[in-house]
Amino acid sequence: MTLWVGCDPGVVSGAIGALDDYGNYVESFDIEHKDKHILALVFKSRLLSIIDPKEGAEICLENVHSMPKQGVVSVWNFGRAVGVISAVCELTRYPVHLVTPQKWKKHFHLTADKSESLDMARYLWPEAKLKLKKDINKAEALLIAEYLRHTLHGIEKQKTA
């Protein structure tokens, strides 16, 4: 059974969400950092710990860009974080796919309002314990994983109750 992994990158707010072939919740976690630096080895170890090598995985990384009016330091820190996260995902040797926020959100009929993503993820995966507002990144990572599962795997395999 393939593990479907979604990644919402960020300097201090990156997260991973993972689902099984049927869209059932497997895991979600924040990507650890220290002083605005992603802890790459910790991230790689944690990511590989949820993937069964016999089963394999497909990883979907949100393809993000700097935002207008961000400062130079913010853009640099964000770009560095995205680069580290992307490199770690590539080094797992599992397929890595990119999707823009607009594309996966449109798939779920969501707007740019992050609270909509949190509400949808809470509804789809109540066992994920997305209780806090700060869990938005884990929620979006799970939705990115579900987007990948829908688009690559098809939606004939539905989430089990």
Predicted feature residues:
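Phosphate- and other anionic-substrate recognition elements at nucleic-acid/protein interfaces
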Residues: M1-A161
